[in-house]
C-alpha cells in the first residue's frame, strides 16, 4: 500500500464516470505540480472546474502510472470565472455549452451559480434562454446539487453511493431528511444495506434502542432475511424471538411494534395449521394467488384430444421409442388436463416423456412455450427437444422496479403469453414469486406441464413450490421411477439413485468408466489433486479440456471451499503472463481468460449477440469468460455463452471466480465432467440433497475426490431445513372446499 496524502486542486477533466455508482477517474490540477494528478474512486457528479481536496493513497497503475485512490473528498463550487465556465460547460447541465456558459458568467460573475439555483427568472436576459428553459436549468441544477449532497451523505457513512438514485426517485429533494428521520429505510429489500450497518448509523444520529422505527424495521428485515433463506412466512413466536436476538431486546418489547405493522399492512398475519404465520405482504399475495390459479387449472376442463392413444402410438413410431406405462400415462394426462407434474430422477425417462408431450401438443395445433429458470437449463431443454427454449424471465419480459426493489414483468394478465401451453423444466428451482408471475402471464385455457426432480435442492428463493404441489396430492402428477436399462449402465446414474435411497454408492472405480473415487482426506492433498485433474490428467488422459470441467464444493469457505479452490485453479489454469492483461479488485485478480460467475442480478448491463441483437441483464449464477481488459483496466469484456457484455471496473465487485462453484450455484446446469471436492463443512451443507444434486450435474464423467467419511455422512443425512410455506395446505383445503 502506498503513502497516504492530501492534495488540493481544481478538476481539469473527468476521464471516466459511472453514473450508477459514482466511480470516477479524473485529472486534478494541483498548484506547484507540472502534471495533473490522476484521481480514482467514488466521486459522484464530478465536473471540470470544481475545487477538491482529496485524501487518499498512492498506487502505480501498470499503464497509467501513479494515481491517487480517493478515500475522502471535500468539494467546493468553482469561484474563479474560468472555472465556472468550465464547470457549466462540462455537460452537467444539458444544453449548456461553452458559449452559453461564457454569457452566463459574463452577466452574473461570481453570483452565477446562485442565480441559476435561486433566481432562475433572471436568466431570461441571456440570449437563447426562455422562461421555460430557465426553469429547466434551475430544476436540473438543484437536482444535481441535491443528488451530489445525497451521495456525499451516503459516502460519509461508507454506504454505496449508487443508492442515491433510487432514494432520490422515491423521496426527491427530501431524501437526506428522510434518512435522518428514519435511517432504517436503508434496510429495506430494495436498498439491501445490512441491518447492523444501518443500526450503527441510526445510533450516531441519536436513535434509541427502543425507537419504534428501529423495532418495526428489524421485524421487516428479519422476514426479508428468512425469505432469502426459503421461508414464505415465519411463525409469530419465531419472528419475535429472532428479532429480539438481532436487537438484544425481549420478545415482549416487540409485540406492540409487530401489531402496529400488522395494523398498517406492513405484515400480514394468518393462521396456518394452527400457527400464527407472519408474511411479507408480497409473499402472502404470491402464495394465495398461486394456490388459486393452480386449483383453477386443476378444475377447469380443457379440450380433450380424441383418440389420444392412437396419436401416442404414432408419436412412438415417429420418435422410435416404446413408452413405459408411466411415460404413456404422463403423455395421456397432458392431453386430457390443464396441468401436469412430471417428476423423476436421472435415467427415468423424463426427457423422452417430455419430447412426447411436446409432439402431442404440436399435433393438437397448440403453440408451446418451453421454459426453464436459468439460461443453461433453457439451453439444455432446447437441445433435448429440438425446439427453441428460453428462460422464464426472458419469456415474461423481465424488468426491475428500482422504487420497490422487486422484479417486474411485462407479461401479465393484461398482456399474457401468446401460447396455448407452457412447459417448465427444472421446477425445483422455481420459487413462489416466480411461480406467481408465470401463472399470472398465462391466458385462460392454457395448459401447464411442470417437470422436475423433487430430490434436488429446493429453490434459492422463498417456498418449496414443486414439493408442496406434490405433497398436496391435488395436482395431477406422474412420478417416473423406473431406471431404464441404458441408463443403468451409467455409474453416475446408479450413484444418484443410491444416494437418493440414503446409501453411499460403491466407491471402487466403476467399470463403466464414468465415475471415479479418489480418497484425499488431507485438505492440501485434495486441493492439489483437483488442480492436477483439471490441468493435466483429464485433458491429457481422457481428452476433456479444462473448460468442460466443473469443480464443485458444498461450501465457499474453508481450506477446500470454492474460494480456496478458485485461487489454486486460477494459478494453475490461467497464470499471469507477459502481455496478458489483468485487473486487481480487492483481494482478487481478474485476468483475461478467467472463468467467472455473476453473483447478483444486474438488470442494467447491456449485452449483444453475434447476430447484432441485444438486450440487458446479467443474472446471479450466469457464468462467463473474460475476453479482454482494456489497457486502462477500466473496461472488461466478458462472454456469457452467446452474449457479450462490457463491464466497467467497479462491476468486478459483482463477479467471482467460477473454476469452482458451490453445489447450490450449480443448480440447473449440467457439465461434461464434474469433480466434487468432498471435505468437512457446516453440518447444514453436508446433507443428502447437496450430494445428490452434485452427482446429477455430471453428464459424462464424475470424480468424487476427498473424504469418504464426509460422503457417507452426506448420503445418510436426509435432514432438510424446514421451509415455512402455506401452499400445500392452501391447495388441500381449497380443493376439498368444492
What is each residue range found by the language model?
Residues 1-310, 738:
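Accessory, non-ATPase domains that flank or precede helicase/AAA+ motor cores in DNA-metabolism machines
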Residues 14, 54, 598, 626-629, ...:
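A generic structural signal for residues embedded in beta-strands
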Residues 46-48, 416, 442, 590, ...:
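Short, well-ordered loop/turn sites that connect or cap secondary structure elements
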Residues 49-51, 593, 621:
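Loop/turn positions that initiate beta-strands
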Residues 310-338:
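Conserved pre-motif I regulatory segment
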Residues 454-616, 627:
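Conserved helicase motor core of P-loop NTPases
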Residues 501, 613, 620-738:
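C-terminal accessory regions
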Amino acid at each position: 500500500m502506498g503513502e497516504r496524502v492530501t492534495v488540493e486542486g481544481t478538476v481539469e477533466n473527468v476521464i471516466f464516470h459511472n453514473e450508477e455508482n459514482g466511480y470516477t477517474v479524473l485529472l486534478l490540477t494541483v498548484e506547484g505540480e507540472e502534471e495533473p494528478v490522476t484521481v480514482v474512486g467514488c466521486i459522484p457528479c464530478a465536473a471540470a472546474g470544481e475545487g477538491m481536496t482529496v485524501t487518499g493513497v498512492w498506487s502505480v497503475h501498470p499503464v497509467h502510472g501513479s494515481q491517487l485512490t480517493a478515500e475522502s473528498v471535500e468539494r467546493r463550487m468553482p469561484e474563479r470565472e474560468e472555472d465556472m465556465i468550465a464547470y457549466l460547460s462540462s455537460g452537467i447541465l444539458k444544453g449548456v455549452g461553452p458559449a452559453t456558459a461564457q454569457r452566463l458568467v459574463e452577466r452574473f460573475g461570481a453570483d452565477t451559480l446562485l442565480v441559476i439555483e435561486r433566481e432562475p427568472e433572471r436568466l431570461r436576459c441571456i440570449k437563447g434562454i426562455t422562461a421555460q428553459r430557465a426553469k429547466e436549468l434551475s430544476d436540473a441544477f438543484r437536482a444535481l446539487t441535491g443528488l451530489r449532497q445525497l451521495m456525499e451523505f451516503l459516502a460519509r457513512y461508507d454506504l454505496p453511493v449508487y443508492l442515491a438514485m433510487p432514494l432520490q426517485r422515491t423521496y426527491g429533494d427530501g431524501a437526506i431528511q428522510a434518512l435522518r428521520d428514519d435511517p432504517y429505510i436503508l434496510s429495506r429489500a430494495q436498498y439491501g444495506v445490512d441491518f447492523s450497518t444501518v443500526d450503527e448509523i441510526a445510533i450516531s444520529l441519536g436513535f434509541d434502542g427502543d425507537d419504534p422505527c428501529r423495532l418495526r424495521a428489524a421485524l421487516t428485515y428479519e422476514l426479508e432475511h428468512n425469505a432469502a433463506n426459503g421461508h414464505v412466512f415465519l411463525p409469530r413466536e419465531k419472528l419475535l424471538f429472532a428479532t429480539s436476538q438481532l436487537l438484544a431486546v425481549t420478545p415482549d418489547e416487540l409485540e406492540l411494534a409487530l401489531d402496529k405493522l400488522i395494523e398498517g399492512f406492513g405484515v400480514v398475519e394468518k393462521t396456518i395449521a394452527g400457527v400464527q404465520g407472519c408474511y411479507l405482504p408480497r409473499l402472502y399475495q404470491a402464495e394465495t394467488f398461486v394456490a388459486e390459479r393452480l386449483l383453477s387449472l386443476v378444475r377447469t376442463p380443457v379440450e380433450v384430444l380424441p383418440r389420444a392413444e392412437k396419436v401416442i402410438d404414432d408419436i412412438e413410431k415417429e420418435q422410435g421409442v416404446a413408452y413405459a406405462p408411466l411415460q404413456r400415462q404422463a403423455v395421456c394426462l397432458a392431453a386430457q388436463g390443464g396441468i401436469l407434474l412430471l417428476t423423476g430422477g436421472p435415467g427415468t425417462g423424463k426427457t423422452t416423456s417430455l419430447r412426447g408431450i411436446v409432439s402431442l401438443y404440436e399435433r393438437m395445433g397448440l403453440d408451446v412455450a418451453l421454459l426453464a429458470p436459468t439460461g443453461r437449463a433453457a439451453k439444455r431443454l432446447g437441445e433435448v427437444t429440438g425446439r427453441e427454449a428460453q428462460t422464464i424471465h426472458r419469456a415474461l419480459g423481465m424488468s426491475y422496479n428500482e422504487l420497490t426493489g422487486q422484479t417486474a414483468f411485462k407479461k401479465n394478465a393484461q398482456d399474457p403469453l401468446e401460447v396455448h401451453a407452457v412447459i417448465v423444466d427444472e421446477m425445483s428451482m422455481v420459487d413462489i414469486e416466480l411461480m406467481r408471475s408465470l401463472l399470472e402471464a398465462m391466458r385462460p385455457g392454457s395448459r401447464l406441464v411442470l417437470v422436475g426432480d423433487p430430490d434436488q435442492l429446493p429453490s434459492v428463493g422463498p417456498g418449496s413450490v414443486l414439493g408442496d404441489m406434490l405433497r398436496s396430492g391435488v395436482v395431477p402428477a406422474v412420478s417416473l421411477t423406473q431406471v431404464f436399462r441404458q441408463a443403468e449402465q451409467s455409474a453416475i446414474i446408479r450413484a444418484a439413485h443410491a444416494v437418493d435411497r440414503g446409501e453411499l454408492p460403491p466407491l471402487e472405480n466403476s467399470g463403466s468408466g464414468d465415475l471415479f473415487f479418489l480418497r484425499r482426506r488431507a485438505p492440501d492433498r485434495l486441493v492439489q489433486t483437483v488442480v492436477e485433474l483439471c490441468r493435466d490428467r483429464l485433458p491429457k488422459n481422457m481428452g476433456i479440456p479444462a473448460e468442460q470441467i466443473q469443480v464443485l464444493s458444498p461450501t465457499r469457505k474453508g481450506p477446500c471451499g470454492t474460494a480456496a479452490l478458485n485461487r489454486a485453479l486460477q494459478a494453475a489454469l490461467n497464470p499471469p503472463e507477459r502481455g496478458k492483461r489483468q485487473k486487481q479488485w480487492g483481494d482478487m485478480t481478474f485476468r483475461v481468460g478467467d472463468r467467472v460467475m455473476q453473483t447478483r442480478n444486474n438488470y442494467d448491463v447491456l449485452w449483444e449477440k453475434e447476430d447484432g441483437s441485444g438486450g440487458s441483464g446479467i443474472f446471479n449464477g450466469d457464468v462467463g469468460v473474460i475476453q479482454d481488459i482494456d489497457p486502462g483496466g477500466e473496461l472488461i469484456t466478458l462472454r456469457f455463452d452467446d452474449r457479450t457484455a462490457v463491464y466497467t471496473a467497479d462491476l468486478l465487485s459483482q463477479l467471482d471466480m467460477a473454476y469452482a462453484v458451490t453445489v447450490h450455484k450449480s443448480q440447473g446446469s449440467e457439465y461434461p465432467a464434474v469433480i466434487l471436492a468432498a471435505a468437512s463443512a457446516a453440518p447444514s451443507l453436508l446433507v443428502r440433497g447437496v450430494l445428490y444434486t452434485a452427482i446429477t450435474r455430471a453428464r459424462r464423467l464424475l470424480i468424487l475426490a476427498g473424504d469418504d467419511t464426509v460422503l457417507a455422512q452426506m448420503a445418510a443425512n436426509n435432514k432438510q431445513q424446514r421451509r415455512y410455506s402455506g401452499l400445500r395446505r392452501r391447495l388441500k383445503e381449497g380443493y376439498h372446499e368444492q
